[in-house]
Amino acid sequence: MEKSSSMKQWKKGPARGKGGPQNALCQYRGVRQRTWGKWVAEIREPKKRARLWLGSFATAEEAAMAYDEAALKLYGHDAYLNLPHLQRNTRPSLSNSQRFKWVPSRKFISMFPSCGMLNVNAQPSVHIIQQRLEELKKTGLLSQSYSSSSSSTESKTNTSFLDEKTSKGETDNMFEGGDQKKPEIDLTEFLQQLGILKDENEAEPSEVAECHSPPPWNEQEETGSPFRTENFSWDTLIEMPRSETTTMQFDSSNFGSYDFEDDVSFPSIWDYYGSLD
């Protein structure tokens, strides 16, 4: 009795003891849980034993909705649905293949005027184009159009050539003007302007001043002192007359005799006061 009751409970559900932990509690048709927790959905084709794989999902509700969409496509509105209340509110969505298979018919194209529209069915052949060109040559329109186009192209090329010439001339003038404005400078002058080298004209007066400056006393003694032994002759001094020698001598009578042993004494301050009285 227990076996029969247990079988009735799992009549339409997934296989007992297989799949994930919540597989036994799932009541959705075509939905089961993997051992690692993912939910998968499958559906059986009508009048066939084969199953169609619908994919794996994070929740059981998503897998049930995928099963319902597949059932509506395969069995129509009479199909068994896991979530019928959701399918009634929403229309059956069209697949991507059905959305982009629409092609306009000839009747739809004929509704639009031909002027200003691209004729899809027009496929001109090379023979028709050659005939049209020959007709234009005979009438002379083609030669006129060719001459006008050639003249326009020549004028464009001439104007472009002149523009290039003028631009080149302007650039050359700019370079020439730049050369005239900036003359060449000697290297020595450039270094003198920077202050690295000194001017020769400035150096000459300093050299002249150095030449005219009196030499130091050591050089005077060595070169041209009046009492140098080489320039002074003792013979001329001996030959000089006595009168000249006496004039050269100092008059000792004018100076008082001074003895180093004498005591130098100054007048007292009382003598100064007595002279004032």
Curated annotation (Swiss-Prot):
Residues 144-160 have a biased composition (Low complexity). The keyword Nucleus applies. It is found in: Nucleus. It comes from the Eukaryota. Induction: By high-salt stress. Keywords: Activator, DNA-binding, Nucleus, Stress response, Transcription, Transcription regulation. Gene3D superfamilies: AP2/ERF domain. Its main location: nucleus. One of its GO terms (cellular component) is nucleus. Residues 27-84 bind DNA. GO terms for molecular function: DNA binding; DNA-binding transcription factor activity. InterPro entries: AP2/ERF_dom, AP2/ERF_dom_sf, DNA-bd_dom_sf. CDD domains: AP2. The keyword Transcription regulation applies. Pfam families: AP2. Transcriptional activator that binds specifically to the DNA sequence 5'-[AG]CCGAC-3'. Binding to the C-repeat/DRE element mediates high salinity-inducible transcription. Belongs to the AP2/ERF transcription factor family. ERF subfamily. This is Dehydration-responsive element-binding protein 2F. It comes from Arabidopsis thaliana. The lineage of its organism: Eukaryota, Viridiplantae, Streptophyta, Embryophyta, Tracheophyta. The gene is DREB2F.
